[in-house]
Protein backbone atom coordinates (compact mmCIF):
# COMPACT_ATOMS: atom_id res chain seq x y z
CA UNK A 1 0.00 0.00 0.00
CA UNK A 2 1.12 3.57 -0.63
CA UNK A 3 0.27 6.66 1.41
CA UNK A 4 0.84 10.36 0.90
CA UNK A 5 1.93 12.04 4.13
CA UNK A 6 2.16 15.66 5.20
CA UNK A 7 5.73 16.82 5.54
CA UNK A 8 5.98 16.65 9.34
CA UNK A 9 3.81 13.58 9.93
CA UNK A 10 6.43 11.02 8.93
CA UNK A 11 7.86 11.26 12.44
CA UNK A 12 4.49 10.24 13.88
CA UNK A 13 3.70 7.51 11.37
CA UNK A 14 7.05 5.74 11.70
CA UNK A 15 6.36 5.24 15.40
CA UNK A 16 3.68 2.72 14.42
CA UNK A 17 4.62 1.32 11.01
CA UNK A 18 7.89 0.65 9.22
CA UNK A 19 7.68 1.77 5.58
CA UNK A 20 9.73 -0.02 2.94
CA UNK A 21 10.16 3.01 0.70
CA UNK A 22 9.99 6.79 0.99
CA UNK A 23 9.57 8.98 -2.10
CA UNK A 24 10.84 12.57 -1.94
CA UNK A 25 9.71 14.66 -4.91
CA UNK A 26 10.53 18.30 -4.09
CA UNK A 27 10.44 20.91 -1.35
CA UNK A 28 9.15 24.33 -2.33
CA UNK A 29 7.49 27.17 -0.40
CA UNK A 30 4.14 25.44 0.18
CA UNK A 31 3.42 25.95 3.85
CA UNK A 32 5.82 28.50 5.29
CA UNK A 33 3.18 29.62 7.78
CA UNK A 34 3.30 26.21 9.45
CA UNK A 35 6.81 24.88 8.97
CA UNK A 36 9.16 27.80 8.32
CA UNK A 37 11.91 27.57 5.72
CA UNK A 38 12.44 24.71 3.25
CA UNK A 39 15.45 23.48 5.24
CA UNK A 40 13.30 23.13 8.36
CA UNK A 41 10.81 21.10 6.35
CA UNK A 42 13.62 18.89 5.04
CA UNK A 43 14.98 18.31 8.55
CA UNK A 44 11.54 17.20 9.76
CA UNK A 45 11.14 14.86 6.81
CA UNK A 46 14.55 13.29 7.41
CA UNK A 47 13.81 12.77 11.10
CA UNK A 48 10.79 10.73 10.08
CA UNK A 49 12.76 8.68 7.55
CA UNK A 50 15.54 8.00 10.07
CA UNK A 51 12.99 6.32 12.34
CA UNK A 52 12.68 3.62 9.65
CA UNK A 53 16.39 3.20 8.81
CA UNK A 54 15.97 0.12 6.62
CA UNK A 55 13.55 1.90 4.28
CA UNK A 56 15.01 3.14 1.02
CA UNK A 57 14.62 6.82 0.16
CA UNK A 58 13.83 7.38 -3.51
CA UNK A 59 14.82 11.01 -4.13
CA UNK A 60 14.46 13.54 -6.89
CA UNK A 61 18.15 13.72 -7.80
CA UNK A 62 17.62 17.04 -9.59
CA UNK A 63 16.86 18.77 -6.26
CA UNK A 64 20.05 19.82 -4.43
CA UNK A 65 18.44 19.67 -0.99
CA UNK A 66 17.96 15.89 -1.20
CA UNK A 67 21.71 15.41 -1.64
CA UNK A 68 22.71 17.91 1.04
CA UNK A 69 23.09 15.59 4.06
CA UNK A 70 24.10 12.03 4.75
CA UNK A 71 21.28 9.70 5.77
CA UNK A 72 21.05 6.45 7.68
CA UNK A 73 18.69 5.21 4.96
CA UNK A 74 19.87 3.81 1.63
CA UNK A 75 19.08 6.22 -1.21
CA UNK A 76 18.30 5.98 -4.90
CA UNK A 77 17.82 8.89 -7.28
CA UNK A 78 15.68 9.71 -10.29
CA UNK A 79 15.93 12.74 -12.57
CA UNK A 80 16.09 14.30 -16.02
CA UNK A 81 18.85 13.74 -18.58
CA UNK A 82 17.04 14.92 -21.71
CA UNK A 83 19.09 17.91 -22.87
CA UNK A 84 22.73 18.41 -23.93
CA UNK A 85 24.91 20.12 -21.28
CA UNK A 86 24.83 23.92 -21.30
CA UNK A 87 26.50 26.06 -18.65
CA UNK A 88 23.94 28.24 -16.86
CA UNK A 89 22.78 29.70 -13.57
CA UNK A 90 19.32 29.52 -12.06
CA UNK A 91 17.21 32.69 -12.06
CA UNK A 92 18.48 35.14 -9.43
CA UNK A 93 15.20 34.91 -7.48
CA UNK A 94 15.32 31.11 -7.12
CA UNK A 95 15.33 29.41 -3.70
CA UNK A 96 17.81 26.71 -2.74
CA UNK A 97 20.67 27.48 -5.15
CA UNK A 98 23.47 27.83 -2.58
CA UNK A 99 25.82 24.88 -2.25
CA UNK A 100 24.93 23.09 1.02
CA UNK A 101 28.61 22.32 1.58
CA UNK A 102 30.30 25.70 1.03
CA UNK A 103 27.50 28.24 0.30
CA UNK A 104 28.84 29.06 -3.17
CA UNK A 105 26.19 29.64 -5.85
CA UNK A 106 25.41 26.40 -7.68
CA UNK A 107 25.94 26.18 -11.42
CA UNK A 108 23.93 23.99 -13.78
CA UNK A 109 24.55 21.94 -16.90
CA UNK A 110 20.78 21.63 -17.39
CA UNK A 111 17.74 23.16 -15.66
CA UNK A 112 14.21 21.83 -15.85
CA UNK A 113 12.65 24.55 -13.70
CA UNK A 114 13.33 26.51 -10.48
CA UNK A 115 16.40 24.95 -8.81
CA UNK A 116 15.91 21.49 -10.33
CA UNK A 117 18.45 20.11 -12.77
CA UNK A 118 22.00 18.88 -13.28
CA UNK A 119 23.66 21.06 -10.66
CA UNK A 120 27.26 21.31 -9.47
CA UNK A 121 29.41 23.57 -7.31
CA UNK A 122 32.47 25.01 -9.10
CA UNK A 123 34.03 25.79 -5.71
CA UNK A 124 33.96 22.51 -3.76
CA UNK A 125 32.86 19.85 -6.27
CA UNK A 126 29.41 19.11 -4.79
CA UNK A 127 27.23 17.84 -7.64
CA UNK A 128 24.14 15.93 -8.63
CA UNK A 129 24.44 12.23 -7.76
CA UNK A 130 24.34 9.48 -10.34
CA UNK A 131 20.76 8.81 -11.39
CA UNK A 132 19.29 5.32 -11.01
CA UNK A 133 16.20 6.15 -13.09
CA UNK A 134 16.45 8.68 -15.92
CA UNK A 135 14.08 10.54 -18.19
CA UNK A 136 16.14 10.80 -21.37
CA UNK A 137 13.70 12.32 -23.87
CA UNK A 138 10.70 14.63 -23.87
CA UNK A 139 8.86 13.39 -26.94
CA UNK A 140 5.99 15.88 -26.76
CA UNK A 141 4.31 18.14 -24.22
CA UNK A 142 1.35 20.51 -24.35
CA UNK A 143 -1.07 21.94 -21.80
CA UNK A 144 -3.09 18.72 -21.46
CA UNK A 145 -0.66 15.82 -21.93
CA UNK A 146 2.94 14.70 -22.36
CA UNK A 147 4.93 11.80 -23.81
CA UNK A 148 8.46 10.96 -22.69
CA UNK A 149 11.08 8.22 -22.47
CA UNK A 150 12.25 6.76 -19.14
CA UNK A 151 14.97 4.09 -19.11
CA UNK A 152 14.31 3.25 -22.75
CA UNK A 153 10.52 2.96 -22.47
CA UNK A 154 8.05 5.54 -23.85
CA UNK A 155 5.22 6.57 -21.56
CA UNK A 156 2.45 9.18 -21.61
CA UNK A 157 0.25 11.09 -19.20
CA UNK A 158 -3.04 12.89 -19.79
CA UNK A 159 -2.21 15.99 -17.73
CA UNK A 160 -0.06 18.95 -18.68
CA UNK A 161 2.97 20.57 -17.09
CA UNK A 162 6.58 19.66 -16.47
CA UNK A 163 5.78 19.22 -12.78
CA UNK A 164 3.41 16.39 -13.68
CA UNK A 165 6.12 14.76 -15.78
CA UNK A 166 8.26 14.81 -12.63
CA UNK A 167 5.41 13.11 -10.75
CA UNK A 168 5.20 10.48 -13.47
CA UNK A 169 8.97 9.98 -13.29
CA UNK A 170 8.73 9.46 -9.53
CA UNK A 171 5.89 6.95 -9.97
CA UNK A 172 7.87 5.09 -12.62
CA UNK A 173 10.91 4.98 -10.35
CA UNK A 174 8.77 3.40 -7.63
CA UNK A 175 7.36 0.87 -10.09
CA UNK A 176 10.83 -0.03 -11.35
CA UNK A 177 12.02 -0.43 -7.74
CA UNK A 178 9.32 -3.06 -7.29
CA UNK A 179 10.07 -4.59 -10.72
CA UNK A 180 6.72 -3.74 -12.27
CA UNK A 181 6.61 -4.50 -16.01
CA UNK A 182 6.75 -1.51 -18.41
CA UNK A 183 3.33 -2.34 -19.89
CA UNK A 184 1.73 -2.10 -16.46
CA UNK A 185 3.56 1.15 -15.75
CA UNK A 186 2.35 2.50 -19.08
CA UNK A 187 -1.25 1.57 -18.29
CA UNK A 188 -1.05 3.13 -14.84
CA UNK A 189 0.33 6.43 -16.11
CA UNK A 190 -2.26 6.59 -18.89
CA UNK A 191 -5.14 6.24 -16.41
CA UNK A 192 -6.98 9.56 -16.52
CA UNK A 193 -9.03 10.60 -13.51
CA UNK A 194 -8.90 14.27 -12.58
CA UNK A 195 -9.19 15.20 -8.91
CA UNK A 196 -10.33 18.45 -7.35
CA UNK A 197 -8.30 21.40 -8.57
CA UNK A 198 -5.72 19.28 -10.39
CA UNK A 199 -6.57 20.24 -13.97
CA UNK A 200 -10.15 19.29 -13.20
CA UNK A 201 -12.52 20.20 -16.04
CA UNK A 202 -16.05 21.45 -15.37
CA UNK A 203 -18.84 22.89 -17.50
CA UNK A 204 -20.15 26.39 -16.78
CA UNK A 205 -23.03 27.02 -19.16
CA UNK A 206 -21.67 26.27 -22.61
CA UNK A 207 -18.07 26.91 -21.53
CA UNK A 208 -15.47 24.38 -20.44
CA UNK A 209 -13.34 25.46 -17.48
CA UNK A 210 -10.12 23.92 -16.20
CA UNK A 211 -9.32 24.34 -12.50
CA UNK A 212 -5.67 24.41 -11.45
CA UNK A 213 -4.70 24.72 -7.78
CA UNK A 214 -1.53 26.70 -7.06
CA UNK A 215 0.15 26.60 -3.63
CA UNK A 216 3.58 28.19 -4.01
CA UNK A 217 5.54 30.53 -6.31
CA UNK A 218 7.25 27.71 -8.20
CA UNK A 219 3.89 26.05 -8.81
CA UNK A 220 2.44 29.29 -10.12
CA UNK A 221 5.32 29.73 -12.55
CA UNK A 222 4.89 26.17 -13.74
CA UNK A 223 1.16 26.60 -14.32
CA UNK A 224 1.83 29.78 -16.31
CA UNK A 225 4.36 27.88 -18.43
CA UNK A 226 1.85 25.07 -18.91
CA UNK A 227 -0.89 27.47 -20.02
CA UNK A 228 1.54 28.97 -22.51
CA UNK A 229 1.62 25.62 -24.31
CA UNK A 230 -2.09 25.83 -25.19
CA UNK A 231 -2.55 26.05 -28.99
CA UNK A 232 -5.71 28.16 -28.60
CA UNK A 233 -6.85 31.40 -26.96
CA UNK A 234 -8.64 31.36 -23.61
CA UNK A 235 -9.77 33.55 -20.73
CA UNK A 236 -7.95 33.40 -17.39
CA UNK A 237 -9.55 33.93 -13.98
CA UNK A 238 -7.35 34.01 -10.85
CA UNK A 239 -8.83 33.49 -7.38
CA UNK A 240 -6.72 34.39 -4.35
CA UNK A 241 -7.36 34.18 -0.62
CA UNK A 242 -5.39 35.18 2.47
CA UNK A 243 -6.47 32.34 4.74
CA UNK A 244 -4.16 30.06 6.71
CA UNK A 245 -2.78 26.76 5.49
CA UNK A 246 -4.33 23.56 4.13
CA UNK A 247 -7.83 22.73 5.29
CA UNK A 248 -8.93 26.36 5.47
CA UNK A 249 -7.83 27.73 2.10
Kindly give the residue locations of the regions a language model identified.
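Gly/charged, well-structured mid-domain segments that form the phosphate/adenylate-handling core
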Residues: 140-143, 175-214
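A conserved, hydrophobic alpha-helical segment in the catalytic core
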Residues: 17-24, 116-129, 159-190
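Short, polar loop motifs at secondary-structure junctions
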Residues: 10, 61-65
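Short, conserved loop/helix-junction motifs that constitute active-site signature segments
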Residues: 16-18, 48-53, 70-72, 230-232, ...
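Extended acidic/charged loop-beta regions that coordinate divalent cations
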Residues: 10-29, 69-154
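Active-site beta-alpha connecting loops in nucleotide-dependent enzymes
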Residues: 195, 213-249
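Single conserved hydrophobic/aromatic residue that forms the stacking wall/gate
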Residues: 1-9
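Glycine/threonine-rich flexible loop motifs
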Residues: 32-40, 247-248
